[in-house]
Amino acid sequence: MTDKDFKSGFAVMAGLPNAGKSTLLNAVAGGLLSAVSPKPQMTRQNIIALSEGEKHQIIFVDTPGFLEAKYKLQEIMKGSLSQALEEDADVAVFVFDPLQEYSAHKKLISKLQNIKCPLFVLINKADTQPVEKLRKIEEQLKKDLPDIEKTFFISAKQNKGVAEFKTAVAETLPFNPPYFPQGQWTDRWERFYVAEFIREQIFNLYEKEVPYCTYVEVETFTEDLGPKNYIKAKIYVERESQKPIIIGSKGSSIAKLRVSAQKRIEEFLGRKYRLELEVSVEPQWRSSKKCLQKFGFITE
């Protein structure tokens, strides 16, 4: 087989917060690659997962949920979605959430009307909705997005309809040599996923504004293929009042967080670790250009 017979390209996923894009990324990747939470706005940076076949390589891109920016970090998140759609996408994938009002999707639909690449629509969570409602949504989407390549009713959580969708994407990709070596499944280092899985557990264990105000930095990551595998991570919050919430009475909350995050990390990496967590305050870091540069959200 030559490169002329091979197809590869980027499939950029767009949707509202909590539409199920990260769950879909895990489904197409065949594993727990992306951090997920029932709470919205879990994804802050573009994350890719590779799906390979004998004659194709699909690079799926999970982007932050489309939302109105209220602070600098959200502006960056929104910008990363726009850049991925406008500059990187060979295929665009609109993950529609039928649990949210159709009107809530209007601004994103307007954005998708201007893309130049083939567009697939996935109406997710189809197992939770009557078929009549799904058909009405499909009809309205075809009116608003007349150039849709194909629409799928799927359940990313149940992995239903995902295989058919992947086949359709693979057929639509341009002829290219593979972008990544065979067997590679992402472009991120293990440290990134360790931080993401700690933050995932923060989202799952804490309430109100606290999860949204946290950033996790992995300070130490050592391995000796034995009992001394060790990770130390620092959890940043924005206010002093949030620090005792993370820690809890006599350290009870952070102990629970450590156990659940360590389990998740060990499942992902396939080996045992000792995880240590520390909490620090970085005032208003989500709106601070200096902090966002320090944390890698701004690279210029």
From Swiss-Prot:
InterPro entries attached to this UniProt entry: G_ERA_dom, GTP-bd, GTPase_Era-like, KH_dom-like_a/b, KH_dom_type_2, KH_sf_prok-type, P-loop_NTPase, Small_GTP-bd
Ranges for region G1: 15-22
Cell compartments where the protein resides: Cytoplasm; Cell inner membrane
Disulfide-bonded cysteines: none
Gene Ontology biological-process annotations: ribosomal small subunit assembly
Region span, G5: 154-156
Positions annotated to bind GTP: 15-22, 62-66, 124-127
Region (G3): 62-65
Top-level taxonomic group: Bacteria
A molecular-function term among this protein's GO annotations: small ribosomal subunit rRNA binding
Job description of the protein: An essential GTPase that binds both GDP and GTP, with rapid nucleotide exchange. Plays a role in 16S rRNA processing and 30S ribosomal subunit biogenesis and possibly also in cell cycle regulation and energy metabolism.
Family listed: Belongs to the TRAFAC class TrmE-Era-EngA-EngB-Septin-like GTPase superfamily. Era GTPase family.
Assembly and binders: Monomer.
Annotated protein name in UniProt: GTPase Era
